[in-house]
Amino acid sequence: MLDVGRRVYFRNTRTADEVPGFSKDYKGGYNHYQFVMRGKISASGNVMSLVDSDVETTTIPSEYCFYGLFEDCTSLISAPELSADVLKGNCYKNMFKRCTSLVKAPELPATRLAESCYESMFSMCTSLSEAPALPATTMVEDCYNQMFYECTGLKSAPALPAEKLAEYCYSGMFKSCTNLNLVKASFTEWMDYATDNWLDGVAKEGTFICPDALDKATTGTGNIPEGWTAAFEVKANGKPETHDYYTTFHSGKNAYQVPGDMTAYTAVAHGSILLLTPVANGIIPAGEAVVLKCAQSMCYLPYTTGTATKSSNNALKGTDKSATLGANDYALSLGQEGVGFYLWNGKPIGANKAYLPLGGIAPATTKALGIEFED
């Protein structure tokens, strides 16, 4: 029993292999070290001090290393630092499960994951209001399985940067997160079992941000939830004082509805002027290249099943993948002469971007053509 404000310190004085339960042969289960606490408790310091007295290693030494360490500690209000960047199988499994007073999760810097490393880590942490960043781009089996199950305080998911999935990697990840209404994913193809029930029981309406290449017509608790809007994230450049931001977009395989705070234009060259005309019916057809004028630097283009016809005389071309432009191609930029298309000198542009092939009619510091907007 400690008085209010008092502290107790824990540190390992032996190697990880000398500590029962942290050995390389330990397989988890019921016989594991676990804190039991009452009263409001704040954990601090580096959890690696439990396996390394000098806190020099950033590699988890064994499987199940911190399995269930704070499980059912309903009075835990803050978590210790988790500095490891190389993980082992099941190392953080159930670590904070049912820590219902935990408001903020620790940072998770690891980029090399292991099987089930984060499985059920924050499951039923109902006070958690913000999920930690998940920087890893290579998934492994079960790595995030039920990681945030029933975290009812979450409204948005952490960005999911992985472009390819692994079996059960996101299975049940946000299941029963009843207030979750925003997910941003980077993968371009659904995979069997990878997302089983991952968005079961989330908010009835929400936004699912994803690449153009992902199949958006498949809906359900293991894909995009019914009632949610699939959208493409747009980042634009401009001047905040005018609230005018510009970028280009190539719609690839899907059609998109232009929201009210944005205008999409196709382009036709008239002498020294590039005339920009709004797309018909506010729909960017599949395969169309456009200039976007936005009211803010970041916004979303909702996917639509509506149909529209591509412009027959659009001077803009587009690319679905990151590409290097030709020596005489032009890209939209905020250059010395303002917003316009400037010679890009063979530099790359990102995926789903548009460009202007004009054949080198102006130097790099000069706009190829003046721009006029037809409203």
Named regions from a protein language model:
Residues 7, 12-54, 60, 234-260, ...:
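A short, polar beta-strand/turn micro-motif
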Residues 274-278:
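N-terminal post-signal-peptidase region of extra-cytosolic proteins
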Residues 77, 103, 129, 155, ...:
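N-terminal cationic amphipathic segment used for targeting or macromolecule association
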